[in-house]
Amino acid sequence: MQRPVALALELHRHGASFVVVGSAAAALRGEPARPADLDVVVHPDDAGDFVSAVRALGGDLGLPQLRRCRDVHVDTAWGPLDVFLAAYPVDVPVRVGERALRVAT
């Protein structure tokens, strides 16, 4: 399993709501991609729970920082993460093991 996908699963396990975008989304859709990091979109209404999940994974992210910057890079114990605070894009559920991740189309 690619490390960005493992990071997405851990965020999901910690209660975060998000949509995977970028090369990790392409890989999850079965396209040939080798993501180096995880890119996600988080809706402003879900930002608090997302920040809590990131902090549980060793990331240094605060809610005021995310709301002020609207896109941030965070290093976590599971790898690098780029977060974009915005409305959710169109997505589809993609099953990875026992979990379903929301993945941009």
Q: Where do the PLM segments sit?
A:
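Compositionally biased terminal segments of proteins
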Residues: M1-T105
